[in-house]
């Protein structure tokens, strides 16, 4: 088991280029192609995705709009951030305001921010 852990640690330390090179060497050594396996598994995974309904949303502030001060006030009320942090979030848009919220709460937050003049996206 210690040997397996060492292999995992070694693989984890590879750069992306080194990992790609390793994949190519293993394909040549074993006479297989990773692309073929991905092509076969890809459509099945894509077909299963629409069946799942999204339950957690991220409310993203896309743009502050014209009433930046009002948006900052709403961001502070929603997140509990201090004035400087809320201002930085608003000025750094697009940025997530709240993550991992249910659909109802996400819609409520979106409505609050849009009422203040912001452009908001749910992801």
UniProtKB/Swiss-Prot annotation:
<comment type="similarity">
    <text>Belongs to the bacterial ribosomal protein bL12 family.</text>
</comment>
<dbReference type="Pfam" id="PF00542">
    <property type="entry name" value="Ribosomal_L12"/>
</dbReference>
<dbReference type="InterPro" id="IPR014719">
    <property type="entry name" value="Ribosomal_bL12_C/ClpS-like"/>
</dbReference>
<dbReference type="GO" id="GO:0022625">
    <property type="term" value="C:cytosolic large ribosomal subunit"/>
</dbReference>
<dbReference type="InterPro" id="IPR013823">
    <property type="entry name" value="Ribosomal_bL12_C"/>
</dbReference>
<dbReference type="GO" id="GO:0003729">
    <property type="term" value="F:mRNA binding"/>
</dbReference>
<dbReference type="InterPro" id="IPR008932">
    <property type="entry name" value="Ribosomal_bL12_oligo"/>
</dbReference>
<protein>
    <recommendedName>
        <fullName>Large ribosomal subunit protein bL12</fullName>
    </recommendedName>
</protein>
<keyword id="KW-0689">Ribosomal protein</keyword>
<dbReference type="Pfam" id="PF16320">
    <property type="entry name" value="Ribosomal_L12_N"/>
</dbReference>
<dbReference type="InterPro" id="IPR000206">
    <property type="entry name" value="Ribosomal_bL12"/>
</dbReference>
<dbReference type="InterPro" id="IPR036235">
    <property type="entry name" value="Ribosomal_bL12_oligo_N_sf"/>
</dbReference>
<dbReference type="GO" id="GO:0003735">
    <property type="term" value="F:structural constituent of ribosome"/>
</dbReference>
<comment type="function">
    <text>Forms part of the ribosomal stalk which helps the ribosome interact with GTP-bound translation factors. Is thus essential for accurate translation.</text>
</comment>
<keyword id="KW-0687">Ribonucleoprotein</keyword>
<dbReference type="GO" id="GO:0006412">
    <property type="term" value="P:translation"/>
</dbReference>
<comment type="subunit">
    <text>Homodimer. Part of the ribosomal stalk of the 50S ribosomal subunit. Forms a multimeric L10(L12)X complex, where L10 forms an elongated spine to which 2 to 4 L12 dimers bind in a sequential fashion. Binds GTP-bound translation factors.</text>
</comment>
